Amino acid sequence: MEINNQNQCVPYNCLNNPESEILNVAIFSSEQVAEIHLKITRLILENFLPGGSFAFGLFDLIWGIFNEDQWSAFLRQVEELINQRITEFARGQAIQRLVGFGRSYDEYILALKEWENDPDNPASKERVRTRFRTTDDALLTGVPLMAIPGFELATLSVYAQSANLHLALLRDAVFFGERWGLTQTNINDLYSRLKNSIRDYTNHCVRFYNIGLGNLNVIRPEYYRFQRELTISVLDLVALFPNYDIRTYPIPTKSQLTREIYTDPIISPGAQAGYTLQDVLREPHLMDFLNRLIIYTGEYRGIRHWAGHEVESSRTGMMTNIRFPLYGTAATAEPTRFITPSTFPGLNLFYRTLSAPIFRDEPGANIIIRYRTSLVEGVGFIQPNNGEQLYRVRGTLDSLDQLPLEGESSLTEYSHRLCHVRFAQSLRNAEPLDYARVPMFSWTHRSATPTNTIDPDVITQIPLVKAFNLHSGATVVRGPGFTGGDILRRTNAGNFGDMRVNITAPLSQRYRVRIRYASTANLQFHTSINGRAINQANFPATMNSGENLQSGSFRVAGFTTPFTFSDALSTFTIGAFSFSSNNEVYIDGIEFVPAEVTFATESDQDRAQKAVNALFTSSNQIGLKTDVTNYHIDQVSNLVECLSDEFCLDEKRELSEKVKHAKRLCDERNLLQDPNFRGINREPDRGWRGSTDITIQRGDDVFKENYVTLPGTFDECYPTYLYQKIDESKLKAYTRYELRGYIEDSQDLEIYLIRYNAKHETVNVPGTGSLWPLSAQSPIGKCGEPNRCATHLEWNPDLDCSCRDGEKCAHHSHHFSLDIDVGCTDLNEDLGVWVIFKIKTQDGHARLGNLEFLEEKPLLGEALARVKRAEKKWRDKREKLELETNIVYKEAKKSVDALFVNSQYDRLQADTNIAIIHAADKRVHSIREAYLPELSVIPGVNAAIFEELEGRIFTAYSLYDARNVIKNGDFNNGLSCWNVKGHVDVEEQNNHRSVLVVPEWEAEVSQEVRVCPGRGYILRVTAYKEGYGEGCVTIHEIEDNTDELKFSNCVEEEIYPNNTVTCNDYTATQEEYEGTYTSRNRGYDGAYESNSSVPADYASAYEEKAYTDGRRDNTCESNRGYGDYTPLPAGYVTKELEYFPETDKVWIEIGETEGTFIVDSVELLLMEE
């Protein structure tokens, strides 16, 4: 019998015409709304690759043809289901946004089409980029606004459609972005937004769907209607949202929706007979397919009707039927009817029912009693070819009104198949007044096919609920709403189930398996085919115990080892093991992926695998390549850490172990102590030593480990420095060593390697161009850690190098390397190698890390001869230095000894004054190589004898200060302890020498001094008088006993030591002296190389001027914290007088008559008894 198609929706070809006006009507029926939703779902299922065809499909189906009226009908559909009407203002806002989305999307797809026709045209690229950004901005801000507060449920279907549009748009940008001219960073950001949007949109839709379903707390027809219509309009879309992840699904993907929905109970419109639907909803179960209905006919009050039935079904791949218990009663008013679909493929289902319900409302024995009867007289079951299996009579209640076709042809465009039939009936205690026998039809989506066919050229997703057998301990549970159907669960280790699969490709085709799962524990998944083990791997937990299942709870993770099927019809089994009981493991589905497909994650894995392999000299990972740097290993570690746990957890762990092994090998060959900067100045003779302004920073997006920051300095005499000595015991004779590391940025950073000479390079590295983009904002992880996976790491595992002079190789501008050659080694001499980093400019700075000092290669040929020659020169110069040092040391020691009265060095000679101490100190400082000229805090070959004599000089200063009862007599502390009248100054003359300047005759400087009455004192003053008049230093008591020292410019005076000068030749002498003062007491030397600006020589050429006196041309004179004066300049006079106080207080007064009086020091010394 031919059944006329009663689906009066708009023809499919009209929907494909964006210029069609057919849908431009004021009101949509619920059937039309459902049809459009079903067509969109079909579009996604069948045409799910980015590009114009998919974009135009969305446009033609909905976004290009809907105006305010159509969107209003969409909103009205849900309003009627939940009995809530949106306010006119909110409705107007929502509709205007939807219309705006459509207009913006229209502009975008026009630009997309233009670009597809001319993909190399810069104008087309710019236009599609601009249109994409405009539409993306509109959806990014507009979709959340579709969830109108208080009306989230009423707007849920249009929210889902808007979300679907946004995901499609983002997927286009990720897929085409590189060809559009977007940067990789921009594409990665869009991909992150795509994944986050999938999660957020899914969770919103499922949340409010569940709220709406929960509000219908009584199982009644409205419950099933809500479930059906919101599943079609919202949940079916949501179940397909994950497929928009273009990096996970880069090729066509075949998905299946296994959820089950119900058409309304088969009752006449307006029927009021009471019945219960409480037991109609099926419990979660493995998916089954209807094979036969056995219907029993009863008779009630003269009406023959459907009184009961049995259902025979089968599961996918199952060879036997499942016969369900009897629903209703096995009445015998008529012979039993058997309703069986055709066995012909494609026709073995019912896509439509035409039912004949009957309702009678009859009076009883009195006016109060009425008998209401609701029954079904017959049903026509329609197959896709419109062939009919008839139970008694065909009716007019059409299931297509609720589950319409997806197009015109019932043969190819039906949307659902009849799956099962349950039975609703009146309560026994209500009969016979209310008598109802009502069948309830449940349906599954056409995408869920009776066979699990694995195609060779698509990703085949098979929900595990399509297994034909459950293993003990596995259960089917209701899906969380976003999986497209029910899911399987285990709470203890074991197999889930067996799934029959059909292979259409040659059996040589290889596949890989992925699993969409959620778990509260780390676990192992095992897979087998026909009992043969295929894969086994570890997978991480995805959620915490007690949490509700949400979109983010599920991960798609896979095995990387491909396999083949041995039979065209095979049994696939999956199990979960190695987790403790009472945890929960859920599986949504299994994915079979052609092995030839390359995913972004697999490309990353392959890249990481190559990078790891490139670290080692051989496949057994015994040795590390010499040119693999510490920084390199850290970046490879980042590559491995950024691999997805979902897809390659086992491989990630294996690669991670290999990288850790490489790191240990790197540490073993690194001769530096504490290369990771755990501390500076922690141990006196070990590790790093440095100036106090250096800071250790924790790892960031550039450095995985600690690194150091060196700031600039305001005085080049006091540079910022960091150094370490490589012990002689660690070095091999006649071997080249290399210092290398990574500099994030630097300015005026000087790097030294010192043994026989100084290898030196000044490095300026701008803070851009590193492997991690420094110009971008550093992304932050969820715990505040640097997110090293946020941007794509561009790294060449082949270490493409640009070499200099054929010997030295630097593969990135931020990498530095400096080598030094070692000749013979001597543990007694313990020369070692000094590693120094130094900054001596105000604008200088550096951030560096991953430092290594390692053996590079033995010296041969010319290099060997060169180092032997350099070593001989160094020894010759050292012998010469030793001879010179012996002479200088004897002279300096004689001068130092002369300061003291005995060899215990505990008393000064009576005539020892400050100038004599200064002169002795100068002789001590004539000892060369006390400290390295490159960095004066590092001791040189003569450090021991220098510090011996300098220590005695320090003692002399201390004894001198102790016996001088005048405080601050050298004015080093300014005018502290002095009383001042009038205007005077303390000036630093030529590198920190302080003098008192009395420029005016009315000025006076004085100090009260406590003395011992009856003892003798010597007043000693060193001063210079400039101009006319006299300078006077007076000592007196309160009333009498006054004496004074006078200084005049025009009287010839004896000047210590044995210098004389007159007023006529003073000026010439001053000019000759000007600028010769040196540092007196500033901690350490800054005696730097005079040729520090010369570019680094990367060949192994040695400096010929080793052991030259670096201080001769250097204004920063080393003194290790003690006094360092040159002899007094010509013109200064030292005078003294004896004084015997009679009281315990005296006054020292300094003044002049005219001109300027300059005082270097004032001493009041107690005479020896």
UniProtKB/Swiss-Prot annotation:
Keywords: Sporulation, Toxin, Virulence. It holds the Pfam family Cry1Ac_D5. GO terms for molecular function: signaling receptor binding; toxin activity. One of its GO terms (biological process) is symbiont-mediated killing of host cell. InterPro entries: Cry1Ac-like_dom-VII, Cry_V, Galactose-bd-like_sf, Pest_crys, Pest_crys_Cry1Aa_dom-IV, Pest_crys_dom-III, Pest_crys_dom_I, Pest_crys_N_sf. Belongs to the delta endotoxin family. Toxic segment of the protein is located in the N-terminus. Promotes colloidosmotic lysis by binding to the midgut epithelial cells of lepidopteran larvae. Toxic to Pieris rapae. This is Pesticidal crystal protein Cry1Gb.
